[in-house]
């Protein structure tokens, strides 16, 4: 059963803006592995939280709650966004956060996406134009998968990505 974030973590201290955002989220699940050194916290919210703030939240939870233990803290966020959001509007607002996350995942894919041209030909149809290199051609499908995972699974919006190279 979902609980409000600060009902699950009542002693956690975070900065003012983050406190407001987290007060509007719910924790839907907390899971730990058998070795008890990895914890996953599943958040559900209606307002976007930048990935750098999620990383800071993971650090705060680790430092304040698990300070004397080796614990890998992972926050997995999911959003129920209002009808005003389209994939195009989401990309305008959330692109920096997407790039931040991709940078932590793969520097090569981050650089490819950062330098790519993104053009929406419809609310949920993205033409992604990458530099015509062997690296871009071999890694482009990972970028598409990543974008679809963030936009479709995390944010609940439709996105169709068409690749082009120039």
Q: What is the meaning of each model-derived region?
A:
Residues 1-166:
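Intrinsically disordered, low-complexity basic tails and flexible linkers associated
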């Amino acid at each position: 059963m979902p609980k409000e974030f600060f009902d699950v973590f009542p002693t956690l201290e975070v900065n003012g803006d983050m406190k407001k955002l987290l007060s509007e989220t719910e924790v839907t699940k907390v899971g730990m592995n058998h070795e008890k050194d990895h914890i996953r916290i599943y958040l559900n919210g209606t307002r976007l939280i930048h990935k750098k703030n999620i990383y800071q939240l993971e650090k705060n939870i680790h430092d304040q709650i698990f300070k004397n233990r080796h614990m890998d803290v992972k926050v997995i966020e999911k959003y129920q966004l209002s009808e005003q959001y389209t994939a195009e509007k989401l990309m305008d607002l959330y692109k920096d956060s997407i790039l931040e996350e991709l940078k932590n995942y793969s520097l090569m894919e981050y650089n490819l996406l950062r330098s790519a041209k993104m053009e929406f030909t419809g609310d949920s149809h993205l033409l992604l134009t990458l530099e015509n290199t062997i690296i871009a051609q071999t890694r482009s499908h990972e970028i598409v998968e990543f974008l679809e995972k963030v936009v479709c699974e995390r944010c609940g919006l439709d996105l169709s990505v068409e690749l082009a190279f120039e």
